[in-house]
């Protein structure tokens, strides 16, 4: 079995939580496939990209450099599926093989949660709020910079969560 040591996409090393690398055999051809559980930030970065320059380093010190297609796999955890066509599979004899008609398929989601992934890289999302506040608070909010407001709201929410947990909610 082949073990992936590191993955670099377009020159940038990415944190991989779990992976499966295998040869996929179908009626349309043979492909090298790399399924990765990554952070939501990584998925967001590559979700609209069709092709990537990928370097895969294996624990036996082999390195594969290839232009690979990318698909975002839907499911419980953030996943990328990278794949490229293969003409010669001689150098991939020790890779797992999956046939399109097989019932077995690598499951890389077992034993990891979205909470564990977010401890490594927490995504930020823009949010708009409609509030009804006293005018003095509105004026004060308008004078603040976005970075300060982000920090204030993050702190307030975390403090509120702690209070809720201590009350048993």
Which ranges hold each PLM region?
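Short beta-strand and beta-hairpin "edge-sheet" elements
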Residues: 57-90
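Short, ordered beta-strand-loop transition motifs
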Residues: 22-31, 70-79, 123
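Short, conserved charged micro-motifs
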Residues: 41-48
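Solvent-exposed edge beta-strands and adjacent loop segments
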Residues: 1-33
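Short Lys/Arg-rich basic patches
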Residues: 102-135
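Short conserved beta-strand and strand-loop elements enriched in small hydrophobics
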Residues: 2-8, 48-62
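Helix-rich interaction surfaces within compact, conserved domain-sized segments
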Residues: 83-112
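Short, basic amphipathic alpha-helical segments that act as recognition/interaction helices
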Residues: 148-169
